[in-house]
Amino acid sequence: MDEMHSSDTLLLRTPKSKKKIGLVIPSTPSKKCKYSSGFIAEDTTPSKRFRLYQAKFKTSSKNVKAQTLSVSIKKNQGEITNPFMTEGYNDYRNIVSPGLSFDNDCFSEHELVSPLSDISSINSTSPDVEKIDSLDPFGVDSFVWNCKPLVNKEALELHRMIHSSFPMSPLESNSDVPLLLPKLKKRLSPVNRSTFKPTRYEPSHRLLKPKKSILTVPAKSLNLIVSSSRGSLNDATIFATEINSTLSNEENKLPAISSIWEKLTIPVNSSIKEKYKKLKDQIYGQASNFGEDEDNEEDNEDDLPDAAVIRGYEFQSGRRDELTQCNELQSTKDYKKVQWAKVLEQ
């Protein structure tokens, strides 16, 4: 039994080959890119792409010093000129820095620095440099400085000082130095000219009498005129308006008049005529009754029938034979132009 027990214990043991495992647990790689001394990347496989971060240098508000300019208003009389006479030329000879007493002085170190530059405007020999380095050793401040208001302010100040140096008061009469002013071109009105001739709103034709008519009249056609049997112009206008409106439809046709000896009489319903007159009086008023005297005379003649009379009249034109007219029209094709007057009366 002892042997059996010993054999069981041997069978339950873990073999030595299973005790040691050659597997290595991988560690989470760094997301940053690592380079060796020879600028060769190490054999690493990161889980995400590494990002290259570039430091953003911001302008420190502590290292900016506003610069001002002053203009000397003392000028010699020989230097008085108009700067607007020459284009693209600006005279800044009298603009001096406040740190200089006269023109022969040299600019100091802090005056050569622009307010937009990242370089400190404090002199390198000044003891204030150590204070700034202790506060911000890298020259980077968390405050983002906006330079646009300062630039606008400096530009307006410079513009004001330049224009303030110009002589605002006129020169004395005893002064021999002339003040040059820009020459302005005088625009003369065409009305004041001696050669000006006012014209009317009339077109200037190439030909005084155009040979071709605008309206084309058919051959052997008549001009139909409507009149009233009682001689009233108002009634004739009403009759012609009604006839033109009814002739627009194909169903309403009137007998054609082929000669000047023919006459067409159409009886008229007087109630319709009175309806038109009342409607016209409501729209235009009593002033439209320009034939009131004739209407009073017509009222006395009740025995005359109320009717519309249509007569035909020939067109009177100075045209010649058709062949001669065709030749004239062909020769005047180049003259079909109208030129309006160049100068119109105002």
Curated annotation (Swiss-Prot):
Biological process annotations from GO: cell-cell adhesion; invasive filamentous growth; mitotic cell cycle; positive regulation of filamentous growth; pseudohyphal growth
Keywords: Nucleus, Transcription, Transcription regulation
Major place of residence: nucleus
Superkingdom of origin: Eukaryota
Biased composition (Acidic residues): 291-305
Coiled coil (residue ranges): none
GO cellular component, one term: nucleus
Subcellular location: Nucleus
Keyword Protein transport: no
Disordered as annotated region, ranges: 289-308
Entry function: Probable transcription factor required for superficial pseudohyphal development in response to nitrogen starvation.
Protein name, entry field: Superficial pseudohyphal growth protein 1
